[in-house]
Amino acid sequence: MVRIGLLGCGNVGRIIATHQDGFTVEALFDRLPDHAEELARMCGAPAYADFQEFISQDFDICVEAASVLAVREYAPKILENGKHVLILSVGALSDTNFRKILLDVARSQGKKIHIPSGAIMGLDNLKVGGISRIDSVLLRTTKSPASLGMQVSHRTLAFRGKANECIKQFPKNINVSVALALAVHHDVDVELWADPEVDRNIHDIFVSGEFGEASIRVVNHPSPDNPATSYLAALSVLSLLKNLDSPLVIGS
């Protein structure tokens, strides 16, 4: 059974901690201690107000469900303390210098950095970009204006550009673009739309390359209590954790 420490006790953290299947939650940490203590009462795992005390506990992998800033602050320390790390706020890895530092630490410690599929599907197949030519990648994401902190009366283009620039402007909303870029080993063109007519998050992905062409549409229900996050993102973490201890692993 995989033992995890949970860094981040907000909405996604609550979903993870209350759906333990194939793993157990051994420790909780949040920069807001009240959040960790509340989740501790729900799932029975101990909460820690001090990060060093948290990371010293006996678990195999630390699951980050907090923020891009939390990844930058804590991910290197997690690896240095001999833990694998699962990063949900993958937007932090859009910084190439930080990504290199993190990979160097992981190699030196013999540990893994796990990136879940998050709010989209198809990443497993699109990893062929690491061994085969990719010509173009477009991600068109549509969300409610409220989830983007906008007030508009009609469908409005909030951003058009590259993934590494989009994540700077919307660090809580478009982590999926960075996960896609890492998977396909290619720049991702991003269109982010605010649409008052939608109540779900929509991701349209268009990829062409040596393998052929792929078009993927994912229409997600927002995560409970947080319209900025897709419920599928939390479920993808649960799936990854369950697979870590499974004798049968499907996909590359």
UniProtKB/Swiss-Prot annotation:
This is L-aspartate dehydrogenase. It comes from the Archaea. The iminoaspartate product is unstable in aqueous solution and can decompose to oxaloacetate and ammonia. Specifically catalyzes the NAD or NADP-dependent dehydrogenation of L-aspartate to iminoaspartate. NAD(+) binds at A119, N175. The keyword NAD applies. The keyword Lyase does not apply. Pathway: Cofactor biosynthesis; NAD(+) biosynthesis; iminoaspartate from L-aspartate (dehydrogenase route): step 1/1. The gene is nadX. GO terms for biological process: NAD biosynthetic process. The lineage of its organism: Archaea, Methanobacteriati, Methanobacteriota, Stenosarchaea group, Methanomicrobia. It comes from Methanospirillum hungatei JF-1 (strain ATCC 27890 / DSM 864 / NBRC 100397 / JF-1). Signal peptide: none annotated. The active site is at H203. InterPro entries: Asp/hSer_DH_NAD-bd (IPR005106), Asp_DH (IPR002811), Asp_DH_arc (IPR022487), Asp_DH_prok (IPR020626), L-Asp_DH (IPR011182), NAD(P)-bd_dom_sf (IPR036291). Belongs to the L-aspartate dehydrogenase family. Its EC number is 1.4.1.21. Keywords: NAD, NADP, Oxidoreductase, Pyridine nucleotide biosynthesis. It catalyses: L-aspartate + NADP(+) + H2O = oxaloacetate + NH4(+) + NADPH + H(+); L-aspartate + NAD(+) + H2O = oxaloacetate + NH4(+) + NADH + H(+). GO terms for molecular function: aspartate dehydrogenase activity; NAD binding; NADP binding; oxidoreductase activity, acting on the CH-NH2 group of donors, NAD or NADP as acceptor.
